[in-house]
């Protein structure tokens, strides 16, 4: 970060906007790489967007009428029906948790992604100059810690339901005797299945992070390389395209979650 009164260079501007407000930067943790180095801004905005989701759906649920619905109620009902149809088509088990979980994931990830459309300096500038907060990243899904935490949550549910539906022995048998149902192939099967199992949360979290981080970098580059009065020329076309990206990424995260949990509920014959 530049010294007080000193303007940031383009590279400094980019580095500054890609830095999280963390416990290490506040001097509360010794090292940025520490396990206990929490990214405060990512946590705050993930909670903030989660509360927005809860607030909107609670408001609609309290005011739902049998008559002519309002615009907000129509939008919420469309989202609920959209998610319910995808769960019905993809998930073939019986679990009342899956549809609410899929709805929560889709809406929450979408709202976190939407933060990428907030102008780059709209929140960091007043935070730094009025509140004394030196760093502020407002896109939680552009933080690998957030996306991997969500992916690990899905992974934990996968393991839980795999053991619950198939039993511990059935789950172990599925890992050991698939794809080759022969005792001599158990080490090879375990290698394949364990790698495949671990790749699911890794790809789930990294896919969302990679797409959102790349989008954030493009917005920052537009802001860093163009004068303030021309920044909209670079940012606006990308923002319009990015609306599609943030929606698709929320949908992909939701669908993969449904697919993985559906696989966990399948009773294997191996």
Swiss-Prot record:
Q: Classify the protein's membrane topology as the record does.
A: Multi-pass membrane protein
Q: What does this protein do?
A: Key component of the proton channel; it plays a direct role in the translocation of protons across the membrane.
Q: Which GO terms describe its biological process?
A: proton motive force-driven plasma membrane ATP synthesis
Q: Which Pfam families match?
A: ATP-synt_A
Please state what the protein is called.
Answer: ATP synthase subunit a 1
- TM region(s), chain numbering: 38-58, 98-118, 143-163, 208-228, 239-259
Q: Which family does it belong to?
A: Belongs to the ATPase A chain family.
- Gene for this chain: atpB1
Q: Origin organism of this chain? A: Vibrio campbellii (strain ATCC BAA-1116)
List the record's Gene Ontology CC terms alphabetically.
Answer: plasma membrane; proton-transporting ATP synthase complex
Q: Which InterPro entries does this one have? A: ATP_syn_F0_a_bact/chloroplast (IPR045082), ATP_synth_F0_asu (IPR000568), ATP_synth_F0_asu_AS (IPR023011), F0_ATP_A_sf (IPR035908)
NCBIfam families membership? ATP_synt_6_or_A, PRK05815.1-1
Q: Is this entry keyworded Ion transport?
A: yes
Q: State the oligomer form and interacting partners.
A: F-type ATPases have 2 components, CF(1) - the catalytic core - and CF(0) - the membrane proton channel. CF(1) has five subunits: alpha(3), beta(3), gamma(1), delta(1), epsilon(1). CF(0) has three main subunits: a(1), b(2) and c(9-12). The alpha and beta chains form an alternating ring which encloses part of the gamma chain. CF(1) is attached to CF(0) by a central stalk formed by the gamma and epsilon chains, while a peripheral stalk is formed by the delta and b chains.
The record's section on Gene3D superfamilies has: ATP synthase, F0 complex, subunit A
Is the Lipid metabolism keyword given for this protein?
no
Signal peptide extent:
none
Q: Which CDD domains match?
A: ATP-synt_Fo_a_6
Q: Keywords, A to Z?
A: ATP synthesis, Cell inner membrane, Cell membrane, CF(0), Hydrogen ion transport, Ion transport, Membrane, Transmembrane, Transmembrane helix, Transport
Among PROSITE patterns, the record links this protein to:
ATPASE_A
